[in-house]
Amino acid sequence: MGWLSCLDIEAGKVSLGFVFFKMKPSFILILLAVFVYGFIHSVLASDKVKALSRRWFGPASERAYRVVYNLFAALSFLPVLALAGILPDQLIYRIPSPWTLLSLALQVMAVLMLGMGLLQTDLWYFLGVRQLLQPGASEPNELVISGLYRRVRHPLYTAGLLFIWLAPQMTLNLLALNLGLTVYILVGAMLEERKLLRQFGGAYTEYQKRTPMLIPRLGRVE
């Protein structure tokens, strides 16, 4: 049981009401689906599973691992999206026109931010194409701290969070999906922090001290 806040925005007036609702099975199912997806995704990204892959399929499998991993991650997310689309749903709020255009414009900015962040690193390595086409290609060993990475340490995750929460319409199913994805993104960011600390050591510690993780500081960045 819980309280659902409902926003009604019409003709320039905003009214805030509270509706008492039972926790719907669809909400729980979607949350569980996202958590299962995130768990499998994280396990497959671990060094232990990569080592098992090399042992079972040989060193050549390492070249194709990231491409296969990315394809599996994309395809296995489709059933989660399907659940959110087909299960019984309930509207929480809808942003009216013309503010919908602002919401959509901010989502486009989030997508552009995601693209810029990828281009600042090594897009082809991230996708796994470089490893597949260039045997022996090594992981980028330069700590990127310029551009978007000067504002936040994980601009890709920031862009993802902005995109999902700036949707012009929110339903109960979408709320469950967004909450699950937010937890997944935050856990992923913390795991990546540990990896980067192992990789870059003191340089990354200094970077952590002067650059926020996900929420950029206002004002000039030194």
Predicted regions and their residues:
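Membrane-interface helix termini and inter-helical loops of multi-pass transporters
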Residues: L52-R54, I86-P96
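A generic, lipid-embedded transmembrane alpha helix
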Residues: V68-A84
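Membrane-interface loop-to-helix entry segments
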Residues: Y69-N70, T100-L112, S146-T158
